[in-house]
């Protein structure tokens, strides 16, 4: 098998299984350390939005934020960031911080705002409707 061959496994059918790339480790201690490292990186993404050391995804290391944090993954093409910012401008919401990283195929933007949950949810629905959106979610 080569890196260009599709990965097939019966485990791919389960929604509650996360498959990670093979990371070489020839000792029990190395395997345990790798397991802790992978779990830590998944936790940082799910809890904070950080994607440090990502291989096929834009890398972003994020500080903690006390307000609302929204994530937007999109096709890397002109106008997406403008459309995102317009959503908040139309609602009169100031963006406290914004982090953008792209690769050739996709962009990953994290938006921190000081707003209540209703406004954040409304913004999320508008972000999902932006052409080129792959995924958007309200992290917290």
Pin down the residues of each PLM region.
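Rossmann-like dinucleotide-binding domain for NAD(H)/NADP(H)
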Residues: 1-64, 108, 140
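A conserved regulatory-domain signal marking ACT and ACT-like small-molecule sensing domains
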Residues: 52-140
